[in-house]
Amino acid sequence: MQTTTRTLTQHKRIALVAHDSCKKNLLNWTQKHKEALKPHILYATGTTGHILERETGLSIQSLLSGPMGGDQQLGGLIAEKKIDMMIFFWDPMNAAPHDPDVKALMRIATVWNIPVAINQSSADFLLTSVLFEQDVEIDVPDYEGYLKERLA
């Protein structure tokens, strides 16, 4: 598939997601980085978003809870280029009923080439990157070209 570019502006649209056993870790991480996150537009799956907003005072756009379709909503926003990066504290030790949704979410994040952090260390690296506060060009699939090919 051909690619084109997309600009991630200095004010990022960031998805915050955590499995149940990791919500406290994500809350602690978010509290620690509250000032750095403030200028950005934050999204989260339902329960996580409500906890983060209540405990940090940050404005969070809460979607549905992950198992109720929130992971798929988030994937749709990624495909629509409405999410620039994702912080997803996931639990690799416990199976969840919505594991197929999580796999689909990670697949879409990979297809659309957005930066993804899957634990505290990678989230710290992402947030402290010199690119975090800048406009950044990323390669993304050329959907228009893909569609033209398919319809030819």
Curated annotation (Swiss-Prot):
Protein keywords: Lyase
One Pfam family linked to the record: MGS
Domain of life: Bacteria
Gene Ontology biological process: methylglyoxal biosynthetic process
GO cellular component: cytosol
Active site: D71 (proton donor/acceptor)
CDD domains (alphabetical): MGS
Residue ranges annotated for the MGS-like domain, each copy included: 6-152
Family annotation (InterPro entries): Methylgl_synth, Methylglyoxal_synth_AS, MGS-like_dom, MGS-like_dom_sf
Signal sequence range: none
Binding site for substrate: H19, K23, T45, G46, T47, T48, S65, G66, H98
GO molecular function, one term: methylglyoxal synthase activity
Keyword ATP-binding annotated: no
The protein's Enzyme Commission number: 4.2.3.3
Catalytic activity: dihydroxyacetone phosphate = methylglyoxal + phosphate
Family of this protein: Belongs to the methylglyoxal synthase family.
Function: Catalyzes the formation of methylglyoxal from dihydroxyacetone phosphate.
PANTHER family with a match to the protein in the record: METHYLGLYOXAL SYNTHASE
Protein name as catalogued: Methylglyoxal synthase
Native source species: Haemophilus influenzae (strain PittEE)
